[in-house]
Amino acid sequence: MFPLPGKSSKTEDKSFPQKNTLQIDGRLICWDKPQLMGIVNLTPDSFFEGSRAGKSLDRVTELVASHISNGASILDLGGYSSRPGSAEVGLQEEIDRVIPAVKWIASNFSGSLISVDTFRSKVAEEAILAGAHMINDISAGDLDEEMIPTVAKLQVPYIAMHMRGNPQNMQEKTKYSDILGEILYYFAEKLEQLRKFGIKDVIIDPGFGFAKTLEQNYFLLRNLQRFETLSLPLLVGISRKSMISKVLKVNANEALNGTTALNMFALCQGANILRVHDVKEANETLKLYNTLYP
């Protein structure tokens, strides 16, 4: 049994900024309401075809313009599919997918906040130098020992997600004695590590679908409020995932209704950022949530 952080173990703003603020590109961004992160997959094999742009800058432009006009405040670009059992992608291939898109968006959509989804420090560094603003790491530094020092050097916001193993073997690592306690303990230790490196702008992601069974995913979602003990922004990424399609017996293309339902539940449980494929529908959900909780 792992100890659960209690109220006395909350991370106060002496170490990290207040929950609804982030330092981004020299600006203090204040978010009093939940935000939307629009997904742009620079891959040929991400599990939802509608999010794929590949290396086509025309398709990148189409997706980004749609996400921004529909209410996304962050764009999340990824060049390495992390779906269960996904194929390994070489470092240079990931760079070749990500960097041109970052430069294009930074040049043509000025003012947009660009997040890059990578667990590789080299990709992270090149992306920030190309115009990205934050790093979204599915391994929280566990797959590349240089990631955390690199983020510290770059002084950019860092999204730390919980996962065991890697995308190729993570679904073989789903045995927990106390999944909620173990994940909270993992983040408590991870935040201490980040603090020692001077990283202050941190967002946490429980990692739905990463080294978790269907039942474990729903258990974590039901208990999402427990992550409030960490006093940091909470990102939830459940959009069109198999935890929805398996229950509804549909494929990813048909999982929008289920995504919308669970996104509303996540907001009610304390989610601060929703990472989504369908920004328009997520924004409608957010408007209803903000009407319920003005």
Please place each PLM-identified region on the residue numbering:
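N-terminal glycine-rich anion-binding loops that anchor highly charged ligand groups
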Residues: 31-38, 42, 66-78
